[in-house]
Design a protein with these regions (language model features):
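Canonical Rossmann dinucleotide-binding motif of NAD(H)/NADP(H)-dependent dehydrogenases/reductases
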Residues: 1-24
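Substrate-binding pocket helix/loop in short-chain dehydrogenase/reductase
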Residues: 89-90, 94-99, 193
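Active-site helix of classical SDR
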Residues: 113, 147, 155
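Alpha-helical segment proximal to the catalytic Tyr-Lys
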Residues: 118, 159-164, 221
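Residue(s) in the substrate-gating loop at a strand-loop-helix junction
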Residues: 131
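Short C-terminal tail/terminal secondary-structure segment
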Residues: 136, 213, 224-251
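C-terminal helical subdomain
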Residues: 170, 191-223, 230-232
Length: 251
């Protein structure tokens, strides 16, 4: 589990750990990871915290080495959750900033699949956390949007390459309200933020975690290479100026 110390990643970790699974968290925030791991271990859950920047290849090599040395029998699932925003073409996002986001959001998931592909127990499962930003955009989000488009395409590519080894699927969250992970640019502040969604609410981490557990369940092994959008129907809503109460305001 990458990015397992906060937000959606933490929630996913809790779902698996509470069912008795051993979960390895790889997160850049060492202090938060220690806090989360201690809380979960206090509940009797088997959660192990690992620290490092997944943009660094050596971090991934060390992580895989630790997991496999402690569990030589192999693993069952990989959850690629970690990513970050570094802005886009309208602000101070530079070439190196853009590439850094791609290393975290696309290159690291590729490398983890490569490192673990020979070590799955039975038919494994890889779930990549994408975003509705892979398919629609707001201004100045190029670094993050490109990474989420990349992880979505990587999903179906890996599904084909890892046939018989692991199923690979992705989830594209919409507006998810957590302490640290929001696809929207701001927290919901009024009733309209909720009611604009066909589901008339914003999402929460549990909505995503339940879908991840579903995709990792071997009973659902015919689902492969797919992206599941979880956004309360928002991306299906046709929006035009002065239509159904929508109004365009020029920037």
């Amino acid at each position: 589990m990458t990015g397992g110390a906060n937000g959606i990643g933490r929630c996913i970790t809790e779902y698996f750990a509470s069912e008795g699974d051993t979960v390895y968290i790889l997160d850049k925030e060492a202090k938060q990871t220690v806090l989360v791991v201690n809380e979960m271990q206090h509940k009797g859950w088997n959660v192990i915290g690992c620290f490092g920047d997944i943009a660094d290849k050596q971090t991934l090599l060390d992580f895989a080495g630790q997991v496999l040395s402690e569990h030589p029998e192999g693993i069952h699932c990989i959850i690629n959750n970690a990513c970050l925003m570094q802005g886009g073409v309208l602000d101070s996002c530079e070439y190196e900033d853009f590439l850094y986001v791609q290393r975290v959001g696309v290159a690291a998931p590729f490398m983890l699949a490569k490192l673990f592909k020979d070590h799955f127990v039975g038919l494994g499962s890889i779930v990549n956390i994408s975003s509705t930003r892979a398919f629609q955009s707001q201004p100045n989000t190029e670094s993050y949007t490109a990474a989420k488009g990349g992880i979505t395409a990587l999903t179906h590519a890996l599904a084909v390459s890892l046939s018989g080894i692991a199923r690979v699927n992705s989830i594209a969250p919409g507006w998810i309200e957590t302490g640290t992970h929001q696809e929207a640019a701001f927290a919901p502040s009024n009733e309209s933020d909720y009611l604009q969604h066909p589901s008339q609410r914003v999402g929460n981490s549990d909505d995503i975690a339940r879908a991840v557990v579903f995709l990792c369940d071997e009973r659902n092994s015919f689902i492969n290479g797919e992206n599941i959008t979880i956004d309360g129907g928002m991306s299906k809503l046709m929006i035009y100026h002065n239509d159904c109460g929508w109004e365009y305001k020029a920037r």
